[in-house]
Structures are given as structure tokens and as C-alpha cells.
From Swiss-Prot:
A GO-annotated cellular component: cytosol
Pathway: Purine metabolism; GMP biosynthesis; GMP from XMP (L-Gln route): step 1/1
PROSITE patterns per record: GATASE_TYPE_1, GMPS_ATP_PPASE
Residues covered by the Glutamine amidotransferase type-1 domain: 9-207
Name of the protein in question: GMP synthase [glutamine-hydrolyzing]
Enzyme class, spelled out: ligase
Gene: guaA
EC number: 6.3.5.2
Reaction(s) the record says it catalyses: XMP + L-glutamine + ATP + H2O = GMP + L-glutamate + AMP + diphosphate + 2 H(+)
Record keyword Nucleotide-binding present: yes
Complexes and interactors: Homodimer.
Amino acid sequence: MTENIHKHRILILDFGSQYTQLVARRVRELGVYCELWAWDVTEAQIRDFNPSGIILSGGPESTTEENSPRAPQYVFEAGVPVFGVCYGMQTMAMQLGGHVEGSNEREFGYAQVEVLTDSALVRGIEDSLTADGKPLLDVWMSHGDKVTAIPSDFVTVASTESCPFAIMANEEKRFYGVQFHPEVTHTRQGMRMLERFVRDICQCEALWTPAKIIDDAVARIREQVGDDKVILGLSGGVDSSVTAMLLHCAIGKNLTCVFVDNGLLRLNEAEQVMDMFGDHFGLNIVHVPAEERFLSALAGENDPEAKRKIIGRVFVEVFDEEALKLEDVKWLAQGTIYPDVIESAASATGKAHVIKSHHNVGGLPKEMKMGLVEPLKELFKDEVRKIGLELGLPYDMLYRHPFPGPGLGVRVLGEVKKEYCDLLRRADAIFIEELRKADLYDKVSQAFTVFLPVRSVGVMGDGRKYDWVVSLRAVETIDFMTAHWAHLPYDFLGRVSNRIINEVNGISRVVYDISGKPPATIEWE
């Protein structure tokens, strides 16, 4: 019998902050399971979840507006600790009898909070001291409204010059509100405050660890599928690879992985996937060489969105054909992860539907009545990677840069041809190899090469040549929502350019993309 790793759990109610998923990831990093729900859940749903504590997230709305989001009143009647962050603090104050006002000045950026009163939330936590020995905390503020009167049974724990109630608390009820964001790294002691709330005040044990998550997933897979057969589309990406390893641990040869080689992968990627999962780990893999089929379906198509749809459609066709060849397969496994199933908290109806359906493989034939196995659906991407390491997958594979689902289909601009893909594969491999050699690979968030369907004159020896152009792209980003182009050293870029032009026959010019996001996107298509 495996340990119940969901025994202690935190419920996070999402009021729409850009940082809400970060709050959840921080709680998980503390070894405690949590779920992220839209703010307008019912009392029955909260009772059913039975949380050890509740966190109210930040959000873009103003509590002073008439129909702004509110926490269900039951949150404050459930008898568990509650932690309000930014908007979460404001709605807590309003709902419990305090007062919030719009402020003429937005407080955005660093602030120093002075701790005035002892509180379980911040006891012994400080960044520096005032002249008279009071603790100071360096925090990150991002708010317009502010609490102007706290509920009568609360005390002021900390303040700033422009924010009289930066932290408020009701120690008896274990209700806490902070006007700053403890989940962001700019709040230097934020993780310690979250740990204090989750581990000490809510008394949650650290049961949510990679080894225990694996044991739990394996037990749940066995319970769900029994002796039935399972099929999985293995791409070699992080999610499908970790899904494959978990299923292999749970059911061994009853798992069949289908690896569709679409001709749009990186250099030697198909061989690497087969070597690692087939030869090294001993998984049962069907290798389907389908390059010709994908390229002929893409012939003559220039539109990026149409190319994506074609690649998706052909993948489903090929996968379905392979699935139908297998006898007695009852289950389809997918690498769905937690962000895929979190619905935005901004529910237009005012009622939340927390889970949305998400299908990586798309429409399976009607005659294939299969159940769905999704062993990663509670996990964030960083947790999936940690589990992959625990399962023995190589670090370089788990932590490599993102690669788009359609592969080189959207990195060859315009029409996709085998000649273009072959040139691009080799040029891209040189760029990545040089980044690793120069110890720059992990310093950029994503790097790749793009094939441009334009010819350019070049000189080789005594002759002129008229060949293709590629662009190098490297960006630095935290969340991939915005990104800066990476300022790679000129001598490094020169070395990469020389190698590509000299070693890849058919490329005569290399350019470097210096566009940020926005206005450009990270991928060209």
C-alpha cells in the first residue's frame, strides 16, 4: 500500500493573477500537494476537496468595483488557515468587515516592509533591521488598490510608507493577508513565508516528492488498467517520455509505444529515441517511418497554420492505423500535464468549470473505444522533469530547449521539402553543438535555426555560389510570454556562421535574428 501523498493539500483560489501558477509551483516545491481552482467554486466543492489550508491569489480586478470576484464566504468558515495575497488580501479584508480604496498611486516594484507586530507568519524572518531593531523585509509590490481599514479582529503586522497595512493577521483564526507577492523571487524571503504558512501554520507534511509521486503514479496506473494493454504516442519530448517510463514501470510489456518518425525531427533524433527507449530501457516500441507521407501531404503548402493542421491530421491518421493493428488495446495514454487542464479563472459565466478536456492525440476512430490514462495530469513541467531524472532519463534530454510539436515543419518557412529539412537539421545541430561547447546552451532559454526560402550569392574559393540562407535565433525569457534576443558574443556567432557555411553544402549565408517578443514571436511561424 503506497502512502497517501494527497493527504495534506492546499487549495489555491485563482483571481486571475499572472503569478497564480507560480504560487502553486512554490507550494509543490515545499513538498505539499495543491490544486488551483477558479475563485467562484461552491462550498460543496471546497468541503469535498477538504484542504489543510487555502491561499487566495492576486488578480487584476478592483475589489471596489461592484461585481468584482469574491472568495466564497465558506472559505472563512471552514476552520482552516487562509492566506490572502495582494487582491486575495483585499477581498479578505472587504469580506470580513475591513475597507479597501482605490489609490491614486500604483505601488509597483521593490518596497521595504517594516514588521511592527509579532506574527507566526514572519517570526524570525527578516532581510535587515531598522535603526531601532525592527525587522525589514524586501518585497515585490504590484497593486493599485489598498486596504485602508482592517477587520476589527485583525492586527497590523507590517507596513510601508505608502501602504499602512502591508501584512495583517488574525492569529486565532489563522487568517493572514499580505499586500505583496511572496511567490516571486524579488520578494527575497517569500519562500520562507510560504513555507511558514504551508508547513507550520497548516501543518502539512512534505509528502509530495519525486520518489513518492512515482510510487503513487505506478500504483494508480495498475489500479486503473489492471492487466489491460495500453498504447502511447511517443514523440521523444519530455512529457511523452516520462509518461512512457511511468507506464513501463507499472505494466511493462502491456505498454506499446508508437513512435511516428515524420521526417521533421532534429538530426539523429529518431535513432536516439529508438536507442534510448528500445535498446537501453527495453520498452516495447513500434517505429513508423512516415517521412514521405508527411512531406507529400505538405507539398505546395506555404501557410503556417495550414501546415500545422496537416501535420496534426497526418499524425492522427498514422497513429490510428498503427493502433488498429494492435489487438486488445483498451487504453490510450497521453502526456497531459497540469497546466493543460487548468482553465482560466476568468469564467465569463461566473461559474467555474475547473477542468477542460485536453487531447494530445485528437480524434481516435469511433470503433476504438478506449479509456484515457494521464499519469502526469497533476504535475507541472518542472515536476515532470524531476520525475524523469528520478526514473533515470538523461538530464540533457529532460532540460533541452522547447521544440515545437510540428517540428521543422514550422522552422522551414513556406513550403516544406526534404532538401530544406536536411540542410536545416545539419545547420541547427552545429549551432546547438557550439552553444554547448561555449557553455552558453543553459544560459539561453531557447535556441534554434530557421530555414529561409531565399537564395543568396556567396563566394567559395574561386567560384561563386547561389545558395540558401538560414537564420540563428536565441532568446532569454522567464515565461516565454515575453522574451529578449540573446546577446551572444560576436566571435561565437562568427564561428557558428563559418562552420555552417563551410560544412553544410547548400547554405551560403547565416543571419542572426535580433527581434524581441513582442513584437515578434519566438518561432518564425
